[in-house]
């Protein structure tokens, strides 16, 4: 019979971080919120799909708000007080996720939009016919 190994240390280390960076990736289909420390190590993440939304509901502003609240709650428990926000993508949940972070009690010192805009690069896909 195989021997079971016991885990000695907890899986996720709780770190005390006072300032972090919140990355919001908002597409039309989903919103992903990742919170990192200043060096880029991931502290917490959440997405609309991970919060239980499925299908077209993942792209809604309410789903983005729920994902942001879930992620920031984990970081407030680790002692986060200040955050920079980096937003990427054209999705519906951009503004709602930012508002949810501000209402959660974390001081926002910077909001940066890094959405890439093509200077007429690749040809877009064909138009949908419904």
UniProtKB/Swiss-Prot annotation:
Single Gene Ontology MF annotation: rRNA binding
One Pfam family it belongs to: Ribosomal_S11
Principal cellular location given in the protein's record: plastid
Keyword line: Chloroplast, Plastid, Ribonucleoprotein, Ribosomal protein, RNA-binding, rRNA-binding
Membrane-crossing residue ranges in chain numbering: none
Subunit note: Part of the 30S ribosomal subunit.
Cellular component GO terms held in the UniProt record: chloroplast; ribonucleoprotein complex; ribosome
Family membership: Belongs to the universal ribosomal protein uS11 family.
First and last residue of the signal peptide: none
InterPro entries: Ribosomal_uS11, Ribosomal_uS11_bac-type, Ribosomal_uS11_CS, Ribosomal_uS11_sf
Domain of life, per lineage: Eukaryota
Location of the protein in the cell: Plastid, Chloroplast
Matches recorded under PANTHER family: 40S RIBOSOMAL PROTEIN S14/30S RIBOSOMAL PROTEIN S11 (PTHR11759)
Protein name: Small ribosomal subunit protein uS11c
